[in-house]
Curated annotation (Swiss-Prot):
Acetyl-CoA binds at residues 379, 385-386, 404, 422, 439. One of its GO terms (biological process) is peptidoglycan biosynthetic process. The lineage of its organism: Bacteria, Bacillati, Bacillota, Clostridia, Moorellales. It comes from Moorella thermoacetica (strain ATCC 39073 / JCM 9320). This is Bifunctional protein GlmU. Its EC number is 2.7.7.23, 2.3.1.157.
């Protein structure tokens, strides 16, 4: 759609959010509100997208990145004024699609249908409408005897007959640029707010008997705008149900969709089972046949085919195929588990790579560590990687065995096939095939226990 430009109005403050953050940057399902709108526009085939920014302009620009065109509305003087600011950036585009940055539930198919109807009917203006059971608060669509749009009546100006109309204006429009830009120059701020309203452009088109059409959204939930925290939560719940339903239809089992939170950016393969209380966030990718949860959070992670992750928090980590992780494991950024790795209960791993088939079953901290293949890490093993100023690496080569309750003081290397005796504190490299013991020798004092017991009894 090279001849079409989308303009997203995102300059408002959103006072009802009671937030220092611009309204359009509040997040649901892994994206801020305006990102959901931009994603829908892009998936509808519109490549050129202009974002009108105002309140928190630099914050919005930084959040969205350089791929969009930005225009600044320094004073927020209404939707008509905001769109007029985008005229130069729109260039020679023949059709202008206008959307609000706080409508995150719009579907790409709805926008594509709106554009198609606009072109097929050769309209000057096409309005996306919705039919609501309770239209209170919205402008009503007035149609003539031929079904053409004759105007928009705001709630405060509507008579009883007009208030009974259930078709409402969503604030999303297609305009032919040849009519739009001249009409914007004619707008006057003849209202209590002293603002320039985009709805007045529709009125100008109707007065000149230009073809003004309306296309109803199939699902009224799509047009929900977010103006406060309650509406933010409502939109998040709707989007969560939509995401979960799409995944289930694609072959993912979600035991309890109401307690499963999956961002719009997450990808999950078929035959994966997701248990209650699971959060999948960011750019997480789950391959087929996995089992996740309950009580699991994965953010920006990759999980290989057939892995099982239970009661675990993993951040910016890679879990290879056939792994078992948890319960109560913590994988911090930079963790990589190769195939068939076992990470058990109360294990924390940070910035480390664990080789194929290795086991870290319980009560262990591995930081800045490289573990080879077929290694067993005993319970209570700690890599002492931080000296108060710098973090140092630990290397445990293939086939090594680390006994329980061992401390590996970095920088240190345990060679292939080496064995570290339980309770050791290792401060020097262990050669391949060697056994290292670094603990005090046990001393048994005969009869000492009886004497100690008698003294305790005397003290009573």
């Amino acid at each position: 759609m090279a001849d079409t430009v989308a303009v997203i109005l995102a300059a408002g403050q959103g006072k009802r959010m009671h937030s220092r953050r611009p309204k359009v940057l509040h997040r649901i399902a892994g994206r801020c509100l305006v990102e959901h709108v931009l994603a829908a526009v892009g998936e509808a085939g519109i490549k050129k997208q202009i974002v009108v920014i105002g309140h928190g302009a630099e914050e919005v620009r930084e959040a969205l990145g350089p791929e969009y065109t930005y225009v600044l509305q320094e004073q927020q003087l209404g939707t008509g004024h905001a769109l007029a600011r985008a005229r130069e950036a729109a260039g020679t585009a023949a059709t202008v699609l206008v959307l609000c940055g706080d409508t995150p539930l719009l579907r790409p198919a709805t926008l594509a249908r709106l554009l198609k109807e606009h072109r097929d009917r050769q309209a000057a203006v096409t309005i996306l409408t919705a039919v609501l059971d309770d239209p209170t608060g919205y402008g009503r669509i007035i149609r003539d005897g031929q079904g053409m749009v004759a105007g928009i009546v705001e709630e405060r100006d509507a008579n009883p007959v007009e208030k009974a109309i259930r078709e409402i204006n969503t604030g999303i429009y297609c305009f032919e640029a040849a009519y739009l830009w001249p009409f914007l120059e004619q707008l006057q701020p003849n209202n209590d707010q002293g603002e320039y309203y985009l709805t007045d452009v529709v009125g100008l088109a109707c007065r000149e008997n230009l073809p003004v059409q309306a296309v109803a959204a199939g699902d009224p939930e799509e047009i929900l705008g977010v103006n406060d925290r309650a509406q933010l939560a409502k939109a998040g719940a709707i989007l969560r149900r939509r995401i979960n339903m799409g995944l289930m239809q694609a072959g993912v089992t979600i035991i309890d969709p109401e307690t499963t939170y999956i961002d719009a950016t997450v990808r999950i393969g078929p035959d994966t089972i997701i248990y209650p209380g699971t959060f999948l966030e960011g750019n997480t990718i789950i391959e087929e046949g996995c089992s996740l949860g309950p009580g699991t959070t994965l953010r920006d992670c990759q999980v290989g085919k057939g892995s099982h992750v239970i009661h675990t928090v993993a951040l910016e980590s890679e879990i290879g195929p056939g792994c078992q992780v948890g319960p109560f494991a913590y994988l911090r950024p930079g963790t990589v588990l190769d195939a068939r790795v076992k990470v058990g209960d109360f294990v924390e791993i940070k910035a480390s790579r664990i080789g194929a088939g290795s086991k870290v079953p319980h009560l262990t901290y591995l930081g800045d560590t490289t573990v080879g293949t077929g290694v067993n890490i005993g319970a209570g093993t700690i890599t002492c990687n931080y000296d108060g100023e710098k973090k140092w690496p630990t290397v445990i080569e293939d086939g090594a065995f680390i006994g329980s309750n061992s401390n590996l003081v970095a920088p240190v290397r345990v060679g292939a096939g080496a064995l570290v005796g339980a309770g050791s504190t290792i401060t020097e490299d262990v050669p391949a095939g060697s056994m290292a013991l670094a603990r005090g020798r046990q001393v048994n004092l005969s009869g000492r226990s009886k004497k100690s017991s008698e003294k305790r009894q005397e003290k009573g």
